[in-house]
Amino acid sequence: MQICLIDETGTGDGALSVLATRWGLEHDEDNLMALVLTPEHLELRKRDEPKLGGIFVDFVGGAMAHRRKFGGGRGEAVAKAVGIKGDYLPDVVDATAGLGRDAFVLASVGCRVRMLERNPVVAALLDDGLARGYADAEIGGWLQERLQLIHASSLTALTDITPRPQVVYLDPMFPHKQKSALVKKEMRVFQSLVGPDLDADGLLEPARLLASKRVVVKRPDYAPPLANVATPNAVVTKGHRFDIYAGTPV
């Protein structure tokens, strides 16, 4: 995959070329999307819209830390949707990991989550965020146990993941109407990089075959059900709904 690669660390230790080799990235000086290694983290920038700033994965501080400490925990919609109850903490495959927010919420309340991400740039961002999270004194211990990254396409990986999870979680890219600055910033940068998930409808059936209990699909409230397969079961929030489908018992 071609992208502009920029090293702002000033160390000259070749870390960026090692990273490029690992994720199969090729430097393209003219690419509008840039993957930038800063002294603090790896980030994605849209070079023709510098005001958007960089997008990076941070499990330790910022919004994720606030959500972990002060969010709803088990009461969050995604936790309810995957079926967390009492001692039951399902094993989850998040087949559309993105920046890992929902996966992190589930891991923080006790679920073991395997994140799938097919885009190598997004996978590199996730891997960088995980490395910093694993090294953190406060959350590193449980994060290593509960949150892992698999760089693979969900369309193929969903057929051969072992052991089978109890829940498969899907949150395919869908054009957002919301006007919040954060959504606009991230969606604009993200959609410039990966585009819409045009093959997302093909995920539902393999997900249902893989999950032993249920499949949860996050949709904006105005979006049709995935693959146009309606379900009466959903957890509904202000702007989204989490459609719930039966899996395939072991």
From Swiss-Prot:
Enzyme Commission code: 2.1.1.242
Keywords: Cytoplasm, Methyltransferase, rRNA processing, S-adenosyl-L-methionine, Transferase
Disulfide bridge map: none
UniProt-annotated binding residues for S-adenosyl-L-methionine: R101, D102, E117, R118, S153, S154, D171
Gene field: rsmJ
Membership in a protein family: Belongs to the methyltransferase superfamily. RsmJ family.
Main location class: cytoplasm
Highest taxon, organism lineage: Bacteria
Signal peptide stretch: none
Membrane-spanning segments: none
Cellular location(s): Cytoplasm
Annotated catalysed reactions: guanosine(1516) in 16S rRNA + S-adenosyl-L-methionine = N(2)-methylguanosine(1516) in 16S rRNA + S-adenosyl-L-homocysteine + H(+)
Name this protein carries in UniProt: Ribosomal RNA small subunit methyltransferase J
